[in-house]
Each structure stands twice: as structure tokens, then as C-alpha cells.
């Protein structure tokens, strides 16, 4: 990361896409996509996804590292080319607890990530806990971030410190996703970004972390990109020029969250304007979902009724029976809920892929389709871009390859934006 940031600050057009997903097919696609390049791949886990208690994936940071490395070994991607990051490390998971208890857990969270070899650490203590004011004072946020940084430094080996990097600040809104329709988004003001940096510098120095400050490579801001269930706020470069000019006076770059669904030209503009770390998550699993839905439609026509996976019906049944991952985000009417469950850009389905019933139905569908020849006309109907690549000899009509290439479509846009 340090080399990439140095190259960007030296004037090169270079950035990096941060893959924020724990789905094995998404991680496989991210690694296979860059297998034959010289680029490093940045894969990040969030604090609610992966933590010392297992998170919703059931994985600790060490488990997640081994999970990613096993996929890398399978696809032939060198482990040393993987950068592991921890996103929103702080009290995010424990906001319902008092601040002291939440911060104790946050300290252990950061230590677990660093001990597991994660080298990009987002110190985010911006969220209010049960006994806090809303919002937190910037000084309190910075003080807590310094406590988390001290925890990271206390367990890092000398070798790890050479690779260790910190990201500070947070976007608006705080992590969790948009629960209602968006019409516009508040772009971070220069004075707010400057105050974030200033308060963190002061808090770090007060705790004897002056050297650790040199490892702060990025600040999270909102450049004016966001999405909800069916709306996308697109990057307007002219509205972010004050931010772009301010960061040039520092040794840092920006990290932009929620960059999913932007155009490839927008990614290039974002990197040009020093938003050099572009986070993506739901767009990748949305592409996965599109591919699985397309294959399910193909299966519906090619496989006898008694042998079909019922994949789409199973997904719907499970999500309606167990609505905890989508209920507070999606619309309440039955028909509206079904549309959101299936097609929302927020892609809450991503929380359900590990469910045993859904996992088994997808596996059945894949086995069914691997045993038949899929007519080209059906691929043209349901996966038109993949049809074109089959026609040009770049791709085979194999279900797994079709899913991979669908995810590659998202990664291709980021490569265009980030490539030197």
C-alpha cells in the first residue's frame, strides 16, 4: 500500500480497488481476475462480518486470512500479493453497549486483526455508544481512534510495522447502508476533513503515537457517491474539487466508500481527484446474484421439473422466513418487499448465500447445468455480455466461468479507473 500511495502522490494515475466481501466466489473472482497481472489485490473484512467473536460469517480475523489464502492457493494467486484490510474497526458492532465496554471489545478487535496479519487498518470510532451523545464530538472520535491505534501498535511486530497502514475518518452516513431512498448526498467539506486530520494528529501525539502517524495513509470522506435500493448518486467531479486540492497539501490520499455502481469513467475521475482507494462490495455480490438468477432461469427451461433446484423459490422462502438481514432496510408492502429482496442494489441477499438451504439449492443448480449443453441462444438471452465473449473465444459456456465473468464485469470498470 505504501508504494502505491507514494506513486500516486508522485503524480502517477494509480489507485486500488478494495474488495469488501466474504463470499468465496467473489474473492475467487478478484484473485483470478488479477492472477496474470503484477497488481496486488486488496481484500477487506468489516468488523460486523469478521471479529474476535466470529461476526456474522462465523470467522475470526485469523480464520478469514486462512479462508482467503486457501482460495488464493486454489486459483494460483501468490499470497504475498494479497493485502488484507479491516474496515470500520471500532465500536460499530457494540453500539448498544456503554462506551467503556464497547471500546474494550474494540481494542481486542484491532489486536486480533493485526495479530492475524492484516496490514490496512481503518480506525473508526465515529459511532455513538449507549451512553454517548449523538453525534460524538470530533475530539472524542479522535481520542478513541488513538486508543485503537495504540492497541494495534502494541501487538505489531517490527516486521509488521513496516507494512502497517492506518485509515482514519468515516463517510456519511455511518456504516450500515441507506435504509430509505436518497435524492442527494452531503459531500465532505474541506474544513471537516482538515478537522478530522487535526484532531487525530493531536490525539495520537498525546498518546505517544507520533511515529504511528506516519503510517496514516488515507482519510475517509464522502466525495458525493452513494446508492440505495434503486437510486445511484453519480460522482460529479466539479463538486469535489475543493477536497481534491486540499489533500494535495498532505502525504495522504482519500478512501471513498460506497463507490458501487459508478461508471468506469467516474472511477477514473475519482482516482484522478485523489480518491485513490475505492471500496466496492454490494456491486460484486449483485453481479453474482444476477449470474445465479440468470442460470436459474436457464435451468428452469433445460431441466425436468422433478430435478430442478428451485433456487429462486428457495431464496425467496428463506428470506421471507428469516427477514432479520433485510427487514429494516426494505419497503414494507409484500410486493415491494419481494422486488427489493430480489433486485435491490443494496443486495441484502448477500447475507443469505451461506444459508444451508440456499447453498444446497445453488449447488444443485450448478450440477444440473454442468450436465447439459447450454444453448448459445439462452446465454445471449440471459447473459448477453458473456455471449459476446463466448463468440470471440474468450470464455466457455461453463456455469462457473459464466459467474466469474459476470463478477469480472464489475472489476473491469475498477481496473479502468485505477490502472496507471
Swiss-Prot record:
GO cellular component: plasma membrane
Domain of life from the UniProt record: Bacteria
GO biological process: D-tagatose 6-phosphate catabolic process; galactitol metabolic process; phosphoenolpyruvate-dependent sugar phosphotransferase system
Record keywords: Galactitol metabolism
Transmembrane segments: none
UniProt-listed InterPro entries: Aldolase_TIM, GatZ/KbaZ-like, GatZ_KbaZ_carbometab, TagBP_ald_GatZ
Pathway this chain belongs to: Carbohydrate metabolism; D-tagatose 6-phosphate degradation; D-glyceraldehyde 3-phosphate and glycerone phosphate from D-tagatose 6-phosphate: step 2/2
Function statement: Component of the tagatose-1,6-bisphosphate aldolase GatYZ that is required for full activity and stability of the Y subunit. Could have a chaperone-like function for the proper and stable folding of GatY. When expressed alone, GatZ does not show any aldolase activity. Is involved in the catabolism of galactitol.
Subunit structure, interactors included: Forms a complex with GatY.
Family to which this protein belongs: Belongs to the GatZ/KbaZ family. GatZ subfamily.
Name under which the protein is recorded: D-tagatose-1,6-bisphosphate aldolase subunit GatZ
Amino acid at each position: 500500500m505504501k508504494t502505491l500511495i507514494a506513486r500516486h502522490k508522485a503524480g502517477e494515475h494509480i489507485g486500488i480497488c478494495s474488495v469488501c466481501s466474504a463470499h468465496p466466489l467473489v474473492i475467487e473472482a478478484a484473485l483470478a481476475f488479477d492472477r496474470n497481472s503484477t497488481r496486488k489485490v486488496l481484500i477487506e473484512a468489516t468488523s460486523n462480518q469478521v471479529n474476535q467473536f466470529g461476526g456474522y460469517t462465523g470467522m475470526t480475523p485469523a480464520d478469514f486470512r486462512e479462508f482467503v489464502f486457501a482460495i488464493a492457493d486454489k486459483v494460483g494467486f501468490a499470497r504475498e500479493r494479497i493485502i488484507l484490510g479491516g474496515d470500520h474497526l471500532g465500536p460499530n458492532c457494540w453500539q448498544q453497549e456503554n462506551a467503556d465496554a464497547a471500546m474494550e471489545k474494540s481494542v481486542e478487535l484491532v489486536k486480533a486483526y493485526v495479530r492475524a496479519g492484516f496490514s490496512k487498518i481503518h480506525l473508526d470510532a465515529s459511532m455513538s455508544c449507549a451512553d454517548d451523545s449523538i453525534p460524538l464530538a470530533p475530539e472524542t472520535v479522535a481520542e478513541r481512534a488513538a486508543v485503537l491505534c495504540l492497541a494495534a501498535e502494541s501487538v505489531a511486530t517490527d516486521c509488521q510495522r513496516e507494512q502497517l497502514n492506518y485509515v482514519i475518518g468515516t463517510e456519511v452516513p455511518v456504516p450500515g447502508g441507506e435504509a430509505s431512498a436518497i435524492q442527494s448526498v452531503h459531500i465532505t467539506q474541506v474544513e471537516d476533513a482538515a478537522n478530522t486530520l487535526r484532531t487525530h494528529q493531536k490525539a495520537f501525539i498525546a498518546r505517544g503515537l507520533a511515529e504511528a502517524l506516519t503510517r496514516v495513509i488515507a482519510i475517509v470522506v464522502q466525495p458525493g457517491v452513494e446508492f440505495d435500493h434503486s437510486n445511484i448518486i453519480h460522482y460529479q467531479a466539479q463538486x469535489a474539487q475543493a477536497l481534491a486540492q486540499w489533500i494535495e497539501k498532505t502525504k495522504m490520499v482519500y478512501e471513498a466508500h460506497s463507490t458501487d455502481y459508478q461508471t468506469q469513467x467516474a472511477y477514473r475521475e475519482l482516482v484522478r481527484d485523489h480518491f485513490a482507494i475505492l471500496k466496492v462490495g454490494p456491486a460484486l455480490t449483485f453481479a453474482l446474484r444476477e449470474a445465479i438468477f440468470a442460470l436459474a432461469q436457464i435451468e428452469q427451461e433445460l431441466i425436468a421439473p422433478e430435478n430442478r433446484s428451485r433456487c429462486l423459490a428457495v431464496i425467496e422462502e428463506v428470506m421471507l422466513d428469516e427477514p432479520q438481514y433485510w427487514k429494516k432496510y426494505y419497503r414494507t408492502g409484500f410486493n415491494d418487499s419481494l422486488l427489493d429482496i430480489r433486485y435491490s442494489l443494496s443486495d441484502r441477499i448477500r447475507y443469505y448465500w451461506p444459508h444451508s438451504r440456499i447453498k444446497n439449492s445453488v449447488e444443485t443448480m450448478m450440477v444440473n447445468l454442468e450436465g447439459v449443453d447450454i444453448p448459445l441462444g439462452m446465454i445471449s438471452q440471459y447473459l448477453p455480455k458473456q455471449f459476446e465473449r463466448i463468440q470471440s473465444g474468450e470464455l466457455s459456456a461453463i456455469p462457473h466461468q459464466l459467474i466469474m465473468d459476470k463478477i469480472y464485469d464489475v472489476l473491469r470498470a475498477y481496473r479502468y479507473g485505477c490502472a496507471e
